[in-house]
Amino acid sequence: LISPVELRLPEYVRRDILVKERIPYRETTRLEDAMPELDILYMTRVQKERFVSEEEYLRLRDTYILTEDKLTAARSDMAILHPLPRVNEISVAVDKDPRACYFKQVYCGKLMRMALILMLLGLTPEIEE
């Protein structure tokens, strides 16, 4: 779990889910510290609406920007995911990296939503076995 202290996963989530279910996890405030160990890097933007003051948001907004330089420490088979749209948290230069899977992620998400809507409407084709 990588985040500034101000945005860390709430204690009740860590206690009631991670600890209770014995899910191992590690917390850090530095992306660079975790990068060599990651199978998947799931990023989101630093969300302005989570801050009480504009000053706090501006102070932390650019803390976690993924660049080509930071990727040098990452595994060659790591996947980078992001729900999009992005603000500035992933450099556009990262888009050409083979580990950048966020465009495929968004495309597959669209197909899944289409399939779910068809199922809800009862419009799924019969599947022959």
Question: What is each PLM-predicted segment?
Answer:
Residues 45-64:
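Glycine/threonine-rich flexible loop motifs
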Residues 43-44, 83:
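Short, well-ordered coil/turn residues at beta-beta hairpins
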Residues 13-14, 53-55, 91-94:
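Short amphipathic alpha-helical segments
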Residues 77-78, 83-129:
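Adenosine-phosphate binding glycine-rich loop
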Residues 69-77:
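Short, conserved loop/helix-junction motifs that constitute active-site signature segments
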Residues 28-31, 64-68:
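Structural motif corresponding to alpha-helix initiation and N-cap regions
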Residues 1-43:
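Glycine-rich phosphate/diphosphate-binding loop of Rossmann-like nucleotide-binding domains
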Residues 6, 32, 48, 85-86, ...:
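Short, glycine-/Ser/Thr-/acidic-enriched flexible segments
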